[in-house]
Swiss-Prot record:
Source species of the chain: Penicillium herquei
Free-text function comment from the UniProt entry: Prenyltransferase; part of the gene cluster that mediates the biosynthesis of phenalenones such as herqueinone, compounds that have been reported to treat tumors, bacterial infections and/or mycoses, and rheumatic diseases. The non-reducing polyketide synthase phnA synthesizes the heptaketide backbone and cyclizes it into the angular, hemiketal-containing naphtho-gamma-pyrone prephenalenone. The product template (PT) domain of phnA catalyzes only the C4-C9 aldol condensation, which is unprecedented among known PT domains.
Record note on disruption phenotype: Impairs the production of herqueinone, but accumulates phenalenone.
Involved pathway(s): Secondary metabolite biosynthesis
GO molecular function: transferase activity, transferring alkyl or aryl (other than methyl) groups
Protein name from the UniProt record: Prenyltransferase phnF
Any Pfam family hit: Trp_DMAT
Reaction catalyzed: 2,3,4,7,9-pentahydroxy-6-methyl-1H-phenalen-1-one + dimethylallyl diphosphate = 2,4,7,9-tetrahydroxy-6-methyl-8-(2-methylbut-3-en-2-yl)-1-oxo-1H-phenalen-3-ol + diphosphate
Length: 444
């Protein structure tokens, strides 16, 4: 397989040495090379766009090449099982954290290492490859701690069941993704033998909910309440109950919109929980009400019109005109791959309220990715968030060249906007999420 023509100097140098001395079989080498030439090249371009040093690019991409690419299995084909990450079933999502919400632009990504290409029918909910990554992070990342991760793994992961029981649970839950692992890529190396990343793990609550006959939200709530020593962090418990109080006023169906509980792989006194929630109401007013938890999170109103304008601009007209007016169906609401605008709540031991973030999914109401990019750039320019050297449209075009943005939607997934970790502080944080569409367009 030839290397992609548009790439970065660091990626090109690492490609020349890729897998040549590996102990992998020839087939496994070709599979790993596929993921290297697609996903790793995407990330290399993103790191280049974000002005990471060559040292950090080399350190991270070497790790990705040697550890993640071989664990992603085969090239996508018609028989590939769907991951819950990409709308097309592919196992990857990337994001830019924009300059302004951090000291400089940064790159993050998540990957589903569940064995899906081909599917592992003997242990379909195994998180073997993800656990191998967690073990490697334990050796290579500063401040690693898996205290709460281990407890949550025992609560959310069902790999201990027989193959038949796992298959039945997958059918009931509606997806096969066991867990997802995420990486925040730091701007500098702390030492030559360390990885410049912070790891986090995302647990889908659908298996616990299906097994125990409870809602997905209650699966998350009970998981948090079961953590040993969590009573020492009253803000975590009180923030969880603020969300629960809001949902208790809604129809029961709303509690099935919880997609993930994510936690950082750091010590409990520093770990944050992120709860990803879909909103059953697709109107702006309904989404805003969820974002504020019905007014339970104070002092958010000054952001309301900024959010409305962002949703209008990325729609190409107005969100009110282009959004779906159809009644929400439960199958759509709980779909693993069908995406919806969502809210995630950052629960921290330091803050008495959950910090909300609106995750807009513009593909559901915009004509194409070019409309989304231009609308986003207009909003960033208006509110002083634009990059002085390059528009977001040009940056995304520099990362993805497998098709034109004006062809359709799909590259942009979510645009995240909300308060930073402390919801009482007024600074906003913005992320732009993208997926490589490798199930729709394998590229090679």
């Amino acid at each position: 397989m030839s290397a992609p023509t548009q790439t970065t100097p660091v990626f090109k140098a690492l490609t020349e040495a890729s897998f040549s001395d590996s102990s992998l079989s020839e087939e496994a080498k070709q599979n790993a090379l596929y993921w290297w030439n697609t996903s790793a090249n995407d990330l290399a371009r993103m790191l280049h766009q974000a002005d990471y040093s060559e040292e950090v690019q080399r350190g991270f991409l070497s790790y990705y090449r040697d550890n993640i690419c071989p664990r992603l299995g085969g090239k996508p084909d018609k028989d590939s099982a769907d991951s819950g990450v990409g709308w097309d079933g592919n196992p990857l999502e990337y994001s830019f954290e924009l300059k302004g919400s951090t000291k400089k632009k940064s790159v993050r990504f998540v990957v589903d290492l569940t064995e899906l290409r081909p599917a592992d029918h003997s242990n379909p909910l195994s998180m073997k490859h993800t656990q191998e990554m967690v073990d490697l992070l334990a050796e290579k990342t500063p401040n690693f701690d898996d205290t709460w991760y281990k407890v949550l793994k025992n609560w959310f992961v069902y790999a201990h069941l027989t193959p038949e029981e796992q298959t039945a649970l997958i059918a009931k839950a509606g997806q096969q993704t066991s867990v997802i692992i995420g990486f925040d890529i730091y701007p500098k190396l702390t030492s030559p033998d360390q990885l410049p990343v912070m790891g986090k793990v995302y647990f889908p609550p659908c298996y616990v909910a299906s097994d125990k006959g409870i809602s997905r939200w209650q699966a998350v709530r009970q998981g948090i309440q079961s953590l040993p020593g969590v009573e020492s962090f009253p803000n975590i418990l009180s923030s969880t109950e603020i969300i629960n109080d809001y949902l208790s006023e809604k129809p029961d169906s709303w509690q099935m919109g919880t997609r993930y509980l994510a936690t950082d792989l750091v010590s409990p006194n520093k770990a944050r929980f992120k709860v990803y929630m879909r909103c059953f109401d697709t109107s702006f007013e309904g989404i805003w009400d969820y974002y504020t938890l019905g007014g339970r999170i104070p002092n958010l109103d000054e952001d309301r019109e900024k959010f409305r304008q962002l949703m209008d601009l990325v729609s190409g007209t107005t969100y009110a005109e282009t959004r779906s007016k159809d009644d929400m169906q439960m199958g759509r609401f709980t779909s693993a791959t069908g995406k919806l605008t969502a809210i995630y709540f950052n629960i921290s031991p330091d803050n008495p309220y959950p910090a909300p973030k609106l995750c807009i999914y513009p593909s559901n109401f915009a004509k194409d990715d070019e409309v989304i990019a231009k609308g986003l750039d207009e909003w960033l320019e208006k509110y002083g968030w634009s990059d002085d050297t390059k528009s977001m449209e040009d940056q995304v075009k520099s990362v993805f060249d497998h098709r034109k943005l004006e062809e359709t939607t799909g590259i942009f997934t979510f645009i995240g906007i909300g308060r930073k970790e402390d919801p009482t502080k007024k600074e906003l944080s913005i992320q732009v999420y993208m997926t490589p569409e490798l199930y729709r367009t394998p590229r090679y």
